Regions:
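Charge-dense, low-complexity intrinsically disordered segments
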Residues: 44, 48-52, 200-207, 318, ...
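Trp/Phe/Arg-rich N-terminal binding region typifying the photolyase-homology
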Residues: 1-163, 270, 379, 462, ...
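Glycine/tryptophan-enriched, flexible segments
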Residues: 142-298, 302, 410-411, 415-481
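Active-site-proximal binding-pocket segments
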Residues: 234-429
Length: 481
């Protein structure tokens, strides 16, 4: 198969608008390959929730390839070794792929390049994951951006992203190499099956991504600008897991949104705000390419001296949604039961962990990494550091979300909170977010016994806020070389 090439799928599990796959299709026969490399990423290998999504996404990708007369070859093992094996088995020479931006991607790609060149071919990498390549967006002085707003403004001054491309025709090899059976990878949990019912909430795959985008733009985007912060309302796109696995491209989102804006000019403000959230994803990748250690180390080095606390019981209470603060507990339970959490609530629970409990942002980052379907290395690291105060363009240290006020403001009717914290379902609105202030008769009428049916708060808000401000004040005395 001298004219055969491998297309190496990673976090680009789609067929449309995939420049690398289009290029491979023009080179001759194409062997689509996905490699499950369990060691890749080290501490940041795929979390449990992401593995569930990957299983279903690969199922859909394999079916989509069969529909156009091709196949998906599945292999498990160390990436460079597996690709070397496939090149030898098939006689293919070239390896095509989409660019990835994780800190380990360059080293892996260098290894793939060497084995491809040893086979007499080349490793050919194409954009396809971001709207703008990080090295192309620079300040007037030629340096990388460190603040989001001017970064996104600079992006919007660039030429518009190219139009999305359709699914290419793929020429199959004369003989297909062996493919492993997806089920043997055991990506989905069994005992216990903590993902029970997720298949009724989510439809992984390229078609599911397209449906999610179109549904959002047709039915919900008009309320996005003013309503995106209200977790009980379906005003957000929920596209993040699809984007994480590359089942839809940023260009497809960009142009579908631009077309929607032309059809409905009155919704332009909401659509622009939505696209700025795509911009935040771009910014996070921009930052991680500058500072590859960001998932593990503070962007602001002063925070390496912050007096973080260790308290196993408080961490467990936060993880399990038993802090005694209803909006916090609602969010953490939503995360565990669905693999997702509304963005406003993500900010509130992150602030609570880092500022009320003074626990290291890495504790939250790691928990989200394992539990979120959309756990993206760059976005997860940047967002946690933003809330914790150590990141680029970070939230000010004195911005400490009040979990009572946040619940009262963004879930005033309590629909979201009562759904995820059903033991408080009968509590009147007045006391829903501070049940410890409710009279005993009110608690009894609602069937609530604090400390038994629902926990007492693990910290006092006012005291925790003052302690956090004192802790952050210590950084003023840290002298950096």
């Amino acid at each position: 198969m001298a004219n055969a090439s491998l297309y190496w799928f990673r976090q680009d599990l789609r067929l449309a608008d995939l420049p690398g796959l289009i290029a491979a299709s023009k080179s001759g026969q194409v062997i689509p390959v996905f490699i499950f490399d369990e060691a890749l990423g080290g501490d940041w290998k795929l979390g449990g929730a992401s593995q569930w999504w990957l299983h279903h996404s690969l199922q859909k990708l394999a079916a989509d390839l069969r529909a156009i007369g091709s196949r998906l070859v599945l292999r498990r093992g160390e990436t460079v070794h597996v690709i070397a094996q496939l090149l030898e088995e098939t006689g293919a020479q070239n390896v095509f792929a989409s660019r990835q931006y994780q800190p380990w991607a360059d080293e892996t790609e260098q290894g793939v390049r060497k084995v491809a060149e040893s086979a007499g071919g080349a490793f050919k990498r194409y954009p396809g994951t971001l709207l703008f390549e990080p090295e192309n967006i620079r300040t007037g002085g030629g340096t990388p951006f460190k603040v989001f707003t001017p970064f996104w403004r600079a992006c919007l001054k660039q030429p518009a992203p190219a139009q999305p491309q359709p699914v290419p025709a793929l020429t199959s090899p004369n003989e297909w190499p062996h493919s492993e059976v997806l089920d043997t990878w055991e990506l989905c949990p069994k005992k216990p099956n903590w993902a029970q019912g997720w298949d009724t909430l989510w439809t992984p795959g390229e078609a599911g991504a397209s449906t999610a985008l179109n549904t959002f733009l047709e039915s919900h985007v008009n309320r996005y600008g003013d309503g995106r912060d209200f977790p009980a309302q379906p005003n957000t796109s929920r596209l993040s897991p699809f984007l994480k696995f590359g089942e839809i491209s940023p260009r497809q989102i960009w142009w579908t949104a631009q077309n929607a804006k032309q059809r409905s000019p009155n919704e332009g403000g909401s659509i622009d705000k939505f696209l700025s959230e795509i911009g935040w994803r771009e910014f996070c990748n921009h930052l991680v390419t500058q500072f590859p250690a960001m998932p593990d180390r503070a962007w602001n080095p002063k925070f390496e001296y912050f007096p973080w606390q260790r308290h196993a019981a408080n961490l467990t209470a936060w993880q399990s949604g038993n802090t005694g603060y209803p909006i916090i507990d609602a969010g953490m339970r939503e995360l565990w039961q669905t693999g997702f959490m509304h963005n406003r609530v993500r900010m509130v629970v992150a602030s609570f962990l880092t500022k009320h409990l003074l626990m290291h942002w890495r504790e939250g980052e790691q928990w989200f990494w394992d539990c979120l379907l959309d756990a993206d290395l760059a976005s997860n690291a940047c967002s946690w550091q933003w809330v914790g105060g150590s990141g680029a363009d970070a939230s000010p240290y004195f911005r400490i979300f009040n979990p009572i006020a946040q619940g009262e403001k963004f879930d005033k009717s309590g629909v979201y909170t009562r759904h995820w914290v059903p033991e408080l379902a009968e509590m009147p609105d007045k006391y829903l977010y501070k049940p410890w202030e409710a009279p005993e008769l009110t608690l009894k009428a609602a069937g609530v016994e604090l400390g038994k049916t629902y926990p007492n708060p693990i910290v006092d808000h006012r005291e925790a806020r003052e302690t956090a401000l004192e802790a952050y004040a210590t950084l003023k005395n840290v002298a950096m070389a």
